[in-house]
Amino acid sequence: MTSSDPQSHNVFVYGSILEPAVAAVILDRTADTVPAVLHGYHRYKLKGLPYPCIVSSDSGKVNGKVITGVSDAELNNFDVIEGNDYERVTVEVVRMDNSEKVKVETYVWVNKDDPRMYGEWDFEEWRVVHAEKFVETFRKMLEWNKNPNGKSMEEAVGSLLSSGD
């Protein structure tokens, strides 16, 4: 590898991006994933929204997957999708296949005291109800990011994925 080669990133996902079709839209390829656990965080549902968030929690742990080999351009796509409500941070996860500790990027909810946070988010429940809409919406968001045509993201994409919780 030369210094001009693009840097590769690892991204820990724990919500809608666990769905292979959703990850494929963001990456424009099939994701290479490894199951992992993030200690020191808790995953919550968000009232009125169909996606979860994580915030720091001393006794918490979040199961998810590490997407490996993420390029700078793909990482930018994650940033676009996650928007301003999440902050990208570097954390350490434990791979479930070999117990190796790995540094990864993940997205933490900015408002750690958000009153909309509650309960446990359920991936299978989400998948049945929301997966197809997320694929369509994320595709529109990334198309808008490449060519906004003078429109705001909301104008181009429509209202983002409310759940009616």
Swiss-Prot record:
Induction: Expressed constitutively. Gene3D superfamilies: 6.10.250.210, Gamma-glutamyl cyclotransferase-like. GO terms for molecular function: acyltransferase activity. Signal peptide: none annotated. It is an enzyme of class 2 (transferase). Pfam families: GGACT. Keywords: Acyltransferase, Transferase. InterPro entries: AIG2-like, AIG2-like_dom, GGCT-like, GGCT-like_sf. SUPFAM superfamilies: Gamma-glutamyl cyclotransferase-like. Substrate binds at residues 14-19. Its EC number is 2.3.2.-. Expressed in floral organs, leaves, stems and roots. The active site is at residue 82. It comes from the Eukaryota. Putative gamma-glutamylcyclotransferase. PANTHER family: AIG2-LIKE PROTEIN D, PROTEIN AIG2 C. Belongs to the gamma-glutamylcyclotransferase family. This is Protein AIG2 C. It comes from Arabidopsis thaliana. The gene is AIG2C.
